[in-house]
């Protein structure tokens, strides 16, 4: 999900404050390149590429509405001014998953935050989908989580099947308070969504306690997807779990939500995650 405050702050820092008086129709590609190269030369080549892409979108929007006539920025590529983010491939092993779950249970973090972190592990959701989740989004009797379009990355509502483990965790969380938001600030006593930084901070603390190769909350999502494949779950079902659009013609003609299949897949994954190491074969390297 796009964090608009972050985008606004980034554009304000690198574009509005230093270049806000410039007139777009007077700017050629060399002038644009100088702006982004300054960001890259300041030690942020990846951010230079991000700012370039954001500004391309801004200028295209202005072009469509005939507010500007010149679009020289479109001539630039990310590699002309900086570089693209490195593609992460981190997948946690089953031993690491077991260790992580154990660390969560033994941690001093509030129980509501423990549940938050466990649900990220067991559902493969985006953190923003969970931190902004409301009671009305869940039908726990049917093991279904409906993520509204406002919270999904592609802005389309989708249904996610839940395992029995996830349902039990959600019931526990909802029984802890009467607020509409499922995950609220522990000490606030207010019906507001928990801050988006909470899972990131918790993940960083847990990672430090674990040691070994670094990981992020998004790596837990990738781990879910990888293990679903390894467990024999059909690709289209695994993609539905993550809230991804199906590829190609399937996106047009296949509008089935595969909830029953998702629930079966997530129960299979939960069983794999919960089964003691000495009773299972590791299915991923």
Tell me the role of every PLM-derived stretch.
Residues 27, 112-114, 213-231:
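Short basic/aromatic active-site micro-motif
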Residues 83, 91, 147-155, 189, ...:
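Catalytic-site neighborhood detector that most strongly recognizes the C-terminal catalytic loop/helix
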Residues 137-144, 212-214, 233-253, 276-285:
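Short, polar N-cap/turn motifs at the start of nucleic acid-interacting alpha helices
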């Amino acid at each position: 999900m796009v964090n608009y405050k972050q985008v606004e702050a980034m554009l304000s820092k690198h574009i509005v404050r230093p270049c806000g008086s410039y007139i777009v129709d007077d700017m050629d590609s060399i002038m644009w390149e100088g702006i982004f190269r300054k960001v890259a030369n300041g030690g942020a080549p990846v951010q230079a590429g991000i700012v370039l892409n954001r500004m391309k979108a801004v200028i295209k929007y202005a072009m469509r509405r005939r507010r500007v006539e010149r679009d020289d920025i479109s001539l630039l590529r990310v590699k002309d001014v900086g570089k693209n983010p490195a593609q992460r491939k981190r997948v946690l092993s089953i031993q690491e998953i077991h260790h992580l779950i154990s660390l969560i249970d033994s941690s001093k973090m509030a129980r509501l935050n423990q549940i938050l972190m466990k649900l990220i592990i067991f559902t493969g959701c985006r953190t923003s989908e969970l931190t902004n989740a409301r009671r009305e989004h869940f039908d726990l009797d049917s093991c279904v989580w409906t993520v509204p379009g406002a919270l999904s990355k592609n802005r389309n509502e989708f249904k996610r099947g839940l395992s029995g483990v996830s349902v039990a965790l959600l019931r526990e969380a909802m029984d802890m308070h009467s607020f509409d938001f499922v995950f609220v600030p522990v000490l606030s006593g207010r019906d507001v969504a928990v801050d988006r930084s909470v899972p990131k901070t918790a993940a960083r603390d847990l990672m430090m306690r674990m040691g070994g190769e670094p990981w992020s909350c998004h790596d837990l999502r990738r781990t879910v997807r990888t293990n679903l494949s390894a467990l024999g779950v059909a690709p289209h079902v695994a993609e539905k779990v993550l809230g991804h659009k199906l590829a190609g013609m399937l996106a047009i003609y296949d509008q089935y939500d595969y909830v029953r299949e998702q629930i079966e897949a997530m129960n299979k994954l939960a069983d794999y995650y919960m089964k003691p190491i000495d009773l299972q074969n590791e299915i991923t390297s």
